[in-house]
Amino acid sequence: MVRARRTKRASVTDIYRGCKASNTCPPDVINKVEQSTIADKILKYGSAAVFFGGLGISTGRGTGGATGYVPLGQGPGVRVGGAPTVVRPGVIPEVIGPTELIPIDSVTPIDPTAPSIVSLTDSSAVDLLPGEVETIAEVHPGPIDPIEIDTPVVSGGRNTNAILEVADPHPPTRATVSRTQYNNPAFQIISEVIPTSGESSLADHVLVSEGSGGQQIGGTRTAEEIELQPLLSRYSFEIEEPTPPRRTSTPLQRARQQFSSLRRALYNRRLTEQVGVTDPLFFTSPSKLVRFQFDNPVFDEQVTQIFEQDIADFEEPPDRQFLDVVKLGRPTLTESAEGYVRVSRLGRRGTIRTRSGTQIGSQVHFYRDLSTINTEEPLEMQLLGEHSGDASIVQGPVESTLVDVNVTEVPEGVLTETSMDPDTFNSEDLLLDDAIEDFSGSQLVVGTPRRSTTSITVPRFQTPQNPTIYYQDIQGYHVSYPESRERPAIIYPTPDIPTVVIHVADSSGDFYLHPSLRWRRRKRKYL
């Protein structure tokens, strides 16, 4: 039996606040809040006559009052918990008196040869502030290279004319030619560098010569022959595939623990029902499998969904597998035992509902597997392009064809071939194209190159067409079959004696009972 919940009662202060305005408070509430009970009055009147201050009564400090605890037959009391007295050494105070008197010298007359600037500072005054600290820093600058500045040179004397050397306003510019090469392992190019003016080093060709001279020190000995091994190109590289292939990017221990706990919750057959879903709506709109509803583009289906249903209303779900589902969790991607990618949702059914409103149901694991992703073989990278040199020279006059035509003169045979009048002939008429385009049997393509094209085939008709006239035969045809079948006639049983006889010709609509159905009078036998 469930115990009733205990309701918290209102305090005396809350009752006093609510009933004081309407003057409906009980007397005990007023006495307790306003401290007008008998005990309060005794304390008020007794405290006016008797003073117990300093004794520490009902304070809970445990100090024994102002005099402390005094044992019987002993000296004065001792305070409990008092702070110890700190003994400080005595310091001789300094005598504060007037400052020393400085005598004032008599006024000395100013010498006529003395300077007119008089210093206002008195060197005999007492400086109360601390003395200034003089800081001396020696700076030794480094050697500075002389900078050559082109300035005009002026040479001459008193009796010679001035000669000015004027600098060139447009000095020659100094050009620096450099070359930078970046190595890209995904792109290999075979180039022949054409040296330009001003470049003295090329990094593509290195010449090594042996036996070109030198001086030999010591005796003659056989040189050691070292077999050279072919070195790989600097542009080639290999990617090692892990064995076995990795399935996760960051295999952390924490992620494995979460995956194991989730797997126990989904695949526990004793506590969770396993239901495989075949409808593809389970990926995008799983709520449509639970109940009929309209599409809401704002609603996100990738969350936990709760379906509420009244007891009196019962709706058949679109899919019988989602019957009585009241909660459907968010999607979870896992891996099945066969290696497929599985989309799982953990739901709960509301099969039983108690009188208090509690729903009881089992947990259901809805899942659907995706197709496998096969491992493709790696593709070998090919060279993007090769050329024989850095620069391409195109000579227009050599590769183009020039035709010199005099438009003022009519070529021979043109008027004959084109059947033109020599009086109205114009040289621009030769540029006209008289070709006739024939689009019969062609195909019309509608669309842009970036989008999918739609092909429309235009049929080709022959002209003129002979009309086709269809005549319908009115007489028809008679088809005789070689075999005949007899269908049995069904005879429905009819009663011999009618129950009710209705006269149709009679306008009254009355009926007569058959004489055989009338009650027969029983004749009694008299003894």
From Swiss-Prot:
Summarize subunit and interaction data from the UniProt record for this chain: Interacts with major capsid protein L1. Interacts with E2; this interaction inhibits E2 transcriptional activity but not the DNA replication function E2. Interacts with host GADD45GIP1. Interacts with host HSPA8; this interaction is required for L2 nuclear translocation. Interacts with host importins KPNB2 and KPNB3. Forms a complex with importin alpha2-beta1 heterodimers via interaction with the importin alpha2 adapter. Interacts with host DYNLT1; this interaction is essential for virus intracellular transport during entry.
Q: Which Pfam families does this entry report, sorted A to Z?
A: Late_protein_L2 (PF00513)
Please give the positions of the paired cysteines in each disulfide bond.
19-25
Recorded family membership: Belongs to the papillomaviridae L2 protein family.
Q: What is the lineage of its organism?
A: Viruses, Monodnaviria, Shotokuvirae, Cossaviricota, Papovaviricetes
Q: Which GO terms describe its cellular component?
A: host cell; host cell endosome; host cell Golgi apparatus; host cell nucleus; viral capsid
One molecular function GO term is:
DNA binding
Q: Name one GO biological process term.
A: symbiont entry into host cell
Compartments in which it is found: Virion; Host nucleus; Host early endosome; Host Golgi apparatus
Q: Which residues form a coiled coil?
A: none
List residues traversing the bilayer.
Answer: none
Q: According to the UniProt entry, where does the motif Nuclear localization signal sit in this chain?
A: 1-10, 519-526
Keywords, ordered alphabetically: Capsid protein, Cytoplasmic inwards viral transport, Disulfide bond, DNA-binding, Host endosome, Host Golgi apparatus, Host nucleus, Host-virus interaction, Late protein, Microtubular inwards viral transport, Phosphoprotein, Viral penetration into host nucleus, Virion, Virus entry into host cell
What role is this protein assigned?
Minor protein of the capsid that localizes along the inner surface of the virion, within the central cavities beneath the L1 pentamers. Plays a role in capsid stabilization through interaction with the major capsid protein L1. Once the virion enters the host cell, L2 escorts the genomic DNA into the nucleus by promoting escape from the endosomal compartments and traffic through the host Golgi network.
- InterPro entries per the record? Late_L2
Question: Which named protein is this?
Answer: Minor capsid protein L2
Q: How is it modified after translation?
A: Highly phosphorylated.
